[in-house]
Amino acid sequence: MTSKIFKFFLTWWLTQQVTGLAVPFMLDMAPNAFDDQYESCVEDMEKKAPQLLQEDFNMNEELKLEWEKAEINWKEIKNSTSYPAGFHDFHGTALVAYTGNLAIDFNRAVRDFKKSPDNFHYKAFHYYLTRAVQLLNDQGCSLVYRGTKVMFEYTGKGSVRFGQFSSSSLTKRVALSSNFFSNHGTLFIIRTCLGVNIKEFSSFPREEEVLIPGYEVYHKVTAQNDNGYNEIFLDSPERKKSNFNCFYNGSAQTVNIDFSISGSRESCVSLFLVVLLGLLVQQLTLAEL
């Protein structure tokens, strides 16, 4: 009986550690991210991207399936959707696909690009989504809200960026809903000038989604915990030069790129706890046989 009680509390404690309640994510400049803005190579990329898309399809079955579904949805809504000159079907399909089931895996790949650049199978998708956001941007700024189920912290020094495409909402209520937020997470209150309203393209228009590109940098960061949960205010946004530019165009420009793996200490701790949990529970189970 004693061993069962011990096993229960041990499992509970380790689970809390593994789920991230004790290991928050640090908000920084996302140094591993793929942040290409395709400056001065849009015309060339428009020619090359269809080929890259087919190559990605061959390596990424989920992307292929989600793209095909998004193509159908885009054809159904394009005639009732307003979009600027230069915005074509590939851009529309990319936006629709992003609001479906691709966002989590895609953003993980974008955020950790430098750790495994050869395994990045979203080359064309990243281009089309980036261009869609750039074309839709009306040069205006908005106050938006982004809820997360994981805790973020800020060191108090330096500018920050998300390093991935980040969904937000014009409505605080949406960001605080259980679909996006938990009390162990973070509410971001963001002044964005590069984010664009994609309500017309979204699979969930009631969310009033504003999509923020990962290269928007925030120079003023304020964190507080006055409402019983973590809040981070991001202000003074700016579009700064990216680490990558025209990377898949054959005339790549990079800024101080180091492709060595820069894994975080927090990831190592989480992995260790997962392994420890499994081993200890296994030993306790065997001891009761």
Curated annotation (Swiss-Prot):
Pfam families, sorted: ART
Family per record: Belongs to the Arg-specific ADP-ribosyltransferase family.
Maturation propeptide residues: 261-289
Variant or mutagenesis effect after changing residue 80 to C: Changes thiol-independent NADase activity to thiol-dependent
Stated role: Has both NAD(+) glycohydrolase and ADP-ribosyltransferase activity.
Active site as annotated: 146, 167, 209
Gene Ontology MF annotations: hydrolase activity, acting on glycosyl bonds; NAD+ nucleosidase activity; NAD+-protein-arginine ADP-ribosyltransferase activity; nucleotidyltransferase activity
Organism name: Mus musculus
PROSITE patterns tied to this protein: ART (PS01291), TR_MART (PS51996)
Protein name: T-cell ecto-ADP-ribosyltransferase 2
Membrane topology, record value: Lipid-anchor; GPI-anchor
Name of the gene this protein is made from: Art2b
Annotated glycosylation sites: 79, 249
Annotated lipid attachment (GPI-anchor amidated serine): 260
Domain TR mART core: 61-241
Major localisation: membrane
Disulfide bonds: 41-246, 141-193
Gene Ontology cellular-component terms listed: external side of plasma membrane; extrinsic component of plasma membrane; membrane
Signal peptide segment: 1-20
The protein's Enzyme Commission number: 2.4.2.31, 3.2.2.5
